[in-house]
């Protein structure tokens, strides 16, 4: 998939190699001419952060403590220097790497960029080929007399889906759109399996239970749901962060004005002061723990979570992320045949799932203990005080209970996986739905196992692969 990654990326945070690649020298594995621009925080912001005595002490002490615990610190430091702290550089993909890194940003000119900007860019260039319909809720796939997918039925109207925080009581206007060639579903890990089931594709038993005519008995639809785990270790600093002066995290505040006019300052970053990757166990092939330090109170995503950014200016949060999770027992099932009703989503976290050895839970507990070790000197000198998990969670069992009660995830995937139909697969290697002509799925639901630390780049890569597959097949059929 490296080829697809290079095709979509436009890397701006390795200027030396960006220059040398013009002469055929490029060991980094980055892409340079794609649509997804990647940058790192401005140099002046890094200098300002190090001008904050508390920030400098935190970064210096925790970095030294991390290096002291490395099995081979000289080799790791050499690799860090070779890649300049870039976590996505090809040399870092050596299977024995663990170390400190910076967190690249998907920004262009200090403005966030993603699939939204890509779609608008393509629509601007090819308005005759791409039409974007807002306030439209897909309700089912349409089929012709031969059973080939030929379109999508949808409801037109705002806030129709009852997952909305303020759903409308209206039912919407029923509409249809027809496909000349194929239908491609990109609804994500929750809505793609729901839409397939509403269209008669899924577990026959479940479909009949809701009065839906069975078109294809495909039990893998909505199964294999996965996510990674994330949990927070939070400290209270001795005083407010200097770097947060003037930041009210709202449009028009002094920090926003600086970003708006000069594209500088705190709002030109994601807020991560320090990050590292490591293994939760020495015998696993790839690092599976990513931790980053944020000068903020952050304990997950929930309605109003960002209010804590305004409320506290003296917090340090270590966000602990467990990747390559072992639990694939999550499910997406229908609550009813009503397309306005969200599906029932159950990840079956930890012991509820199929990670019977408790490897994910143990990895998170060990990571919290590791964060505590890194910050112990700062506790002893009075720079910070632990807020969470706190003094009531000192033992491994108490930390395990803290993780069970507070872990979250926001990279749901794998609910319509690529694979053999007999093994629970929903789509084949060309993203075509088993047992159906003219229907494909291209989104986060198609992964058999959740990839990497952060899902979005992997989704972009499979989208590039799917585009290549579709174009190849279209050319083959036209000859």
Language model feature labels by segment:
Residues 1-479:
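Structural core of flavin- and non-heme-iron oxidoreductases
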């Amino acid at each position: 998939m490296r080829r697809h990654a290079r095709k979509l990326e436009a890397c701006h945070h390795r200027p030396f190699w960006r220059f040398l690649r013009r002469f055929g020298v490029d060991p980094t594995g980055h892409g340079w001419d794609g649509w997804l621009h990647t940058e790192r925080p401005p140099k002046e912001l890094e200098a300002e952060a190090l001008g904050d005595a508390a920030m400098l002490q935190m970064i210096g002490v925790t970095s030294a403590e991390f290096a002291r615990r490395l099995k081979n610190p000289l080799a790791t430091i050499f690799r860090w220097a070779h890649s300049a702290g870039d976590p996505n550089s090809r040399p870092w993909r050596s299977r024995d790497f663990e170390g400190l890194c910076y967190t690249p940003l998907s920004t262009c000119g200090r403005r966030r960029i993603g699939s939204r900007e890509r779609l608008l860019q393509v629509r601007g260039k090819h308005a005759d080929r791409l039409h974007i319909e807002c306030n439209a809720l897909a309700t089912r796939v349409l089929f012709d007399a031969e059973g080939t997918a030929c379109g999508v039925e949808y409801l037109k109207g705002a806030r129709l889906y009852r997952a909305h925080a303020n759903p409308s009581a209206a039912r919407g206007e029923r509409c249809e759109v027809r496909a000349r060639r194929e239908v491609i579903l990109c609804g994500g890990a929750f809505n793609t399996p729901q839409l397939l089931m509403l269209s008669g594709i899924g577990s026959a038993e479940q479909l009949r239970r809701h009065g839906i005519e069975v078109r294809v008995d495909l039990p893998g639809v909505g199964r294999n749901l996965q996510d990674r785990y994330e949990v927070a270790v939070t400290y209270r600093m001795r005083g407010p962060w200097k770097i947060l002066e003037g930041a009210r995290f709202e449009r028009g505040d002094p920090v926003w004005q600086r970003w708006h006019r000069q594209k500088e300052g705190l709002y030109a970053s994601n807020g991560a002061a320090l990050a590292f990757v490591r293994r939760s166990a020495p015998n696993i092939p790839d690092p599976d723990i990513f931790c980053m330090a944020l000068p903020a109170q952050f304990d997950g995503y929930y309605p109003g979570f960002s209010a804590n950014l305004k409320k506290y200016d003296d917090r340090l949060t270590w966000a602990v992320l467990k990747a390559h999770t072992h639990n694939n027992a999550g499910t997406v099932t229908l609550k009813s045949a009503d397309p306005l009703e969200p599906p029932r989503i159950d990840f079956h976290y930890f012991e509820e799932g199929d990670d019977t050895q408790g490897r994910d839970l143990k990895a998170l507990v060990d990571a919290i203990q590791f964060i505590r070790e890194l910050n112990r000197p700062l506790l002893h000198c009075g720079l910070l005080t632990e807020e969470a998990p706190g003094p009531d969670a000192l033992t491994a069992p108490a930390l395990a209970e803290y993780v069970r009660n507070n872990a979250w995830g926001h990279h749901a995937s794998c609910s319509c996986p690529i694979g053999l139909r007999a093994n629970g697969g929903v789509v084949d290697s060309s993203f075509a739905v088993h047992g159906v002509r003219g229907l494909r799925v291209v989104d986060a639901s198609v992964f058999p196992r959740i990839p990497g630390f952060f899902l979005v780049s992997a989704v972009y890569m499979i989208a590039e692969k799917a585009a290549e597959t579709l174009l190849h097949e279209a050319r083959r059929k036209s000859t």
